Amino acid sequence: MKQYLDLMRRVRAQGTPKADRTGTGTLSIFGHQMRFDLRQGFLLVTTKRCHLRSIIHELLWFLNGDTNIAYLQQNNVSIWDEWADDNGDLGPVYGRQWRAWGTSDGRQIDQLAEVVRQLKQDPDSRRIIVSAWNVGELDKMALAPCHALFQFYVANGTLSCQLYQRSCDIFLGLPFNIASYALLVHMLAQQCDLQVGDFVWTGGDTHLYSNHLQQADLQLTRDPLPLPQLLIKRRPATLFDYRFEDFELTGYDPHPAIKAPVAV
């Protein structure tokens, strides 16, 4: 994952100091792209230990269309706690938009089910896109979508994905986001009888928080290690029937974890 460290170096060298919604302050650049070959290993950062269990549970939660943190809390995943209301609700965030986008005439669109249909029936389509950026519901969301839109592309039997992330917390958020979408590509490839291809990440406001700079500098002293391998042990009936125990990671021997505060 040299690309990730190169991005961090770029922001440290060229980033502009900016104020932000959280009041923390950032070093920020605008516009950056990274390309990863998913065939080379599972995209989990090795220059610090990442919490794959949380990544898997969060993705399963998204895929279930859930927007209440009860499932996450039951599985000891706390990454959304700071934004939930007293009832654990987050409003119409990712899961709602992915699985039940509301239309003006009262219908609901399951964008991910449509992705599966298109990948199987019309894989050359240029419209295999999922958006979480529902302008009409942004004011109801506890947190506006950071990873806002993603598109799939099939060529020569391989499945690739490009994500546009309008706002990116490089140190804490980005390793989660990359691994989550890599996992989704692996799941969709299995469901649609494809091989994994590339994951392309495109960032808008791409930043290091001012209270993450020392941690970033420490991470930049470390050399990337070999990527782990992902095994999906079962092929469920649909994309929405995967369980946590279906996934096994082997060969993950990263550098030690580096703690940093979350900007809320």
Curated annotation (Swiss-Prot):
Pathway per the UniProt entry: Pyrimidine metabolism; dTTP biosynthesis
EC number: 2.1.1.45
Enzyme class: transferase
GO biological process entries: dTMP biosynthetic process; dTTP biosynthetic process; methylation
Active-site residues annotated for this sequence: 146 (nucleophile)
Reaction equations catalysed: dUMP + (6R)-5,10-methylene-5,6,7,8-tetrahydrofolate = 7,8-dihydrofolate + dTMP
Subcellular location: Cytoplasm
Domain of life assignment: Bacteria
GO MF, any single term: thymidylate synthase activity
Family matches, as HAMAP family: Thymidy_synth_bact (MF_00008)
UniProt record similarity statement: Belongs to the thymidylate synthase family. Bacterial-type ThyA subfamily.
Protein name per its UniProtKB record: Thymidylate synthase
UniProt gene name: thyA
